[in-house]
Regions:
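Basic nucleic-acid-binding interfaces
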Residues: 1-75
Length: 75
């Protein structure tokens, strides 16, 4: 399995859009809710500067039901 470190907010959003996710609404603070109308899945994305921690990105992918390998290949 590849590494999920070194991804920034903008890169993650760009890839999530390829998987059909759309911005749904602003959540508390700097967090955003993204939704996939096809799969009816929601995921919460923190909009912070710098690299996303690997554990946080894994949690986002789990919520979105995206395999980490598929995410890495879509880069």
């Amino acid at each position: 399995m590849g590494r999920l470190s070194g991804y920034r907010y903008r890169e993650i959003i760009k890839i999530l859009k390829l998987f059909g996710f759309e911005f749904h609404r602003q959540a508390a603070g700097s967090h955003e809710i993204w939704h996939n109308p096809t799969t009816k899945r929601f995921t919460t994305i923190p909009n912070h500067s710098g690299d996303m921690p690997e554990g946080t990105l894994r949690a986002i992918l789990k919520q979105a039901d995206i395999d980490p390998e598929d995410f890495i290949k879509s880069k």
